[in-house]
Swiss-Prot record:
Coiled coil: none annotated. The keyword Cytoplasm does not apply. This is Small ribosomal subunit protein bS21. The gene is rpsU. It comes from Orientia tsutsugamushi (strain Ikeda) (Rickettsia tsutsugamushi). Keywords: Ribonucleoprotein, Ribosomal protein. GO terms for biological process: translation.
Amino acid sequence: MIHVPVNANNSELAIRSLKKKMQRELVFRSMKMSRFYEPPSVKRVRKKQESERRHRKERAMRRRMMEE
């Protein structure tokens, strides 16, 4: 659940921060993906690509930590 505090009735700032948080958590992507039926074969390929991307990112982070 995403929580966004609204300070001094500043709703525009709250909406902007909500959009940023939703983008960070990939809410928009998951909403877009669930609009249409996705066959199991396509879903499997997409999940594998996402997993590879995540692992590459983790390896890059580890390398950066080792260099420092």
